[in-house]
């Protein structure tokens, strides 16, 4: 593989384990949501996101109903921008009081640092809100890695399974699609990126995917089990 001009990476299942997100972050936000909404619901930023939830369900409803809706969305792993924003705010409090640190695979932390040192700009694209992404990297168990990242993208740029989202990102960072390498564990995301000409690599970590995906499903995406296998 030739050296890309930019690297775009997912987080969950790519730089970090799926289990940390599913077993630590999601339950934490679910437990904290009722108290957080009741305590901060009148804050303009929080109310903005709560209003988006109300608009989504199409009703003028009390906060208790919004809380129940948000908890249901967490259980369903709903990729709703308002949910992701509120989760990010809750996790921010958790990071600040050291309730947890964000999991980062050692190979990912080392390789991101090496690529940054080599002058390759790094970008993050995750369904989690941009503030949540920044907190994740700033409070990782490998230390503060947020300074390695040139820019961050979330679902406000579009769905991760739509090619148009990757076109927007390429335009934003000012690099030809063919010179961007996108790293993800989700084949549908890689398919969408590849349709724009972006290079792709599938992360298939044994911890997250004990049974390898079939060759037919993987298609033409390069398949690796760690960042250390990405050589250019």
Swiss-Prot record:
It is an enzyme of class 3 (hydrolase). Keywords: Amino-acid biosynthesis, Hydrolase, Magnesium, Metal-binding, Methionine biosynthesis. InterPro entries: Enolase-ppase_E1, HAD-like_sf, HAD-SF_hydro_IA, HAD_sf. Its EC number is 3.1.3.77. GO terms for molecular function: 2,3-diketo-5-methylthiopentyl-1-phosphate enolase activity; 2-hydroxy-3-keto-5-methylthiopentenyl-1-phosphate phosphatase activity; acireductone synthase activity; magnesium ion binding. One of its GO terms (biological process) is L-methionine salvage from methylthioadenosine. Transmembrane segments: none annotated. It catalyses: 5-methylsulfanyl-2,3-dioxopentyl phosphate + H2O = 1,2-dihydroxy-5-(methylsulfanyl)pent-1-en-3-one + phosphate. Its cofactor is Mg(2+). Binds 1 Mg(2+) ion per subunit. Pathway: Amino-acid biosynthesis; L-methionine biosynthesis via salvage pathway; L-methionine from S-methyl-5-thio-alpha-D-ribose 1-phosphate: step 3/6; Amino-acid biosynthesis; L-methionine biosynthesis via salvage pathway; L-methionine from S-methyl-5-thio-alpha-D-ribose 1-phosphate: step 4/6. Belongs to the HAD-like hydrolase superfamily. MasA/MtnC family. Monomer. Bifunctional enzyme that catalyzes the enolization of 2,3-diketo-5-methylthiopentyl-1-phosphate (DK-MTP-1-P) into the intermediate 2-hydroxy-3-keto-5-methylthiopentenyl-1-phosphate (HK-MTPenyl-1-P), which is then dephosphorylated to form the acireductone 1,2-dihydroxy-3-keto-5-methylthiopentene (DHK-MTPene). This is Enolase-phosphatase E1. It comes from Xanthomonas oryzae pv. oryzae (strain KACC10331 / KXO85). The lineage of its organism: Bacteria, Pseudomonadati, Pseudomonadota, Gammaproteobacteria, Lysobacterales.
């Amino acid at each position: 593989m030739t050296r890309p001009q930019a690297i775009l990476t997912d987080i969950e299942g790519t730089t970090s384990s799926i289990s940390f997100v599913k077993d630590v972050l999601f339950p934490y936000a679910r437990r904290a949501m009722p108290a957080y909404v009741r305590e901060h619901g009148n804050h303009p930023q929080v109310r903005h996101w709560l209003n988006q939830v109300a608009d989504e369900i199409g009703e003028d409803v009390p906060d208790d109903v919004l809380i129940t809706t948000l908890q249901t969305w967490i259980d369903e792993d709903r990729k709703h921008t308002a949910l992701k924003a509120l989760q990010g705010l809750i996790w921010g409090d958790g990071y600040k009081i050291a309730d947890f640190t964000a999991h980062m695979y050692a190979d990912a932390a080392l390789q991101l640092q090496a690529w940054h040192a080599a002058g390759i700009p790094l970008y993050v694209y995750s369904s989690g809100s941009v503030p949540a992404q920044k907190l994740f990297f700033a409070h990782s168990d490998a230390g503060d890695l947020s300074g390695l990242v040139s820019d961050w993208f979330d679902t406000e740029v579009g769905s991760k399974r739509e090619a148009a989202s990757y076109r927007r990102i390429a335009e934003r960072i000012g690099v030809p699609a063919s010179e961007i390498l996108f790293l993800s564990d989700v084949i549908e995301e890689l398919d969408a990126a590849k349709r724009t000409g972006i290079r792709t690599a599938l992360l298939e970590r044994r911890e997250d995917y004990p049974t390898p995906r079939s060759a037919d499903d993987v298609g033409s995406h390069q398949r690796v089990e760690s960042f250390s296998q990405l050589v250019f």
